[in-house]
Amino acid sequence: SLYGATRRPTDEMLQDVEVLVYDIQDIGSRSYTYIYTMAYAMEAAAEKDIPFVVLDRPNPLGGNLVEGPMLKEEFKSFVGLYPIPYVYGLTCGELAKLFNQEFDINCDLQVIKMKCWNRDMQFDDTGLEWIPTSPHIPHGRTAMYYPATGIIGELRTIDIGVGYTLPFELIGQTWIDADELAKELNSRKLPGVHFRPMYYTPYYFVNEKEHLKGVQIHILDFDEFQPVKSQIHILAALKKLYHEQKLFNKSRNKMFDKVAGSTEIRTSIQNGISAQKIIDRWQDEKEEFEEEILEGEQASGN
């Protein structure tokens, strides 16, 4: 997130501004907040009749991966402002057009397109240098791990590698049996991923200096890997194997639901609903988004 006294430009900030330019690298997941900083800035620009220019940048997950549940209206917040899938398959410029047209911002928007980019490119395919977008997104590949564990991390009951050298690449806790969890997750035969038993000690954050056991997530095929699907299976496996443990934290449930976009994931896991049934519930909305939004961008040659 961008931190400061306000989340949107004030009238004073925009005094004498002739054009407002957005040039920030995003990571392709709904709860990563730069896209809402962009939306708030677009709203402020619209109010002041200031042209808004987006210098488009690659979505590090590529331009075809759409996955996860849609955000429900009542869960709007700074970690999810609009009803889009958790992994949305659009660049920041494409999102700006979506926000402007579908959600009635109506600013004077211009998107400067990228050269040489195509939708099949993940970040490593672009040849660009990755500049960390925040301290816990040190590599372009981290953007693919973020939607695989980031929602779980909001619980604060499961460590996801933040505070260690592998942010978003781990699942750990003192009460996990590393071999057991790895065996369970690998038995689910999730596409493009392997889970390795892992033992580690975070340097800081919630589980600082605790000896944790769990799994390291190894993405074997970044084209086949489905991060949100994998995250739901991780939650379901933890609930199945360690049902006596406190997986959900009442003080963090509200934040978990905001990031997840509704109460559905949390309550379904709590009630023992299978991972596949949870995933099946969002398929119709996801496919509708792909047909209406993503295919429109593909047809326009973006």
Residue ranges and their predicted role:
Residues 26-38:
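Glycine/threonine-rich flexible loop motifs
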Residues 1-16, 29:
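Glycine-rich oxoanion-binding loops at beta->alpha junctions
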Residues 53-75:
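Glycine-rich, charge-decorated loop segments at or immediately adjacent to ligand/cofactor-binding or catalytic sites
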Residues 47-51:
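A short helix->loop->beta-strand "cap" motif at the edges of active sites that frequently abuts
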Residues 19-27, 53-56:
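Short acidic catalytic loops
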Residues 117-198:
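Glycine-rich, aromatic-lined ligand/substrate-binding cores of catalytic
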Residues 172-281:
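Conserved functional hotspot residues or short segments at active or partner-binding sites
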Residues 75-149:
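Conserved anion/nucleotide-ligand pocket segment
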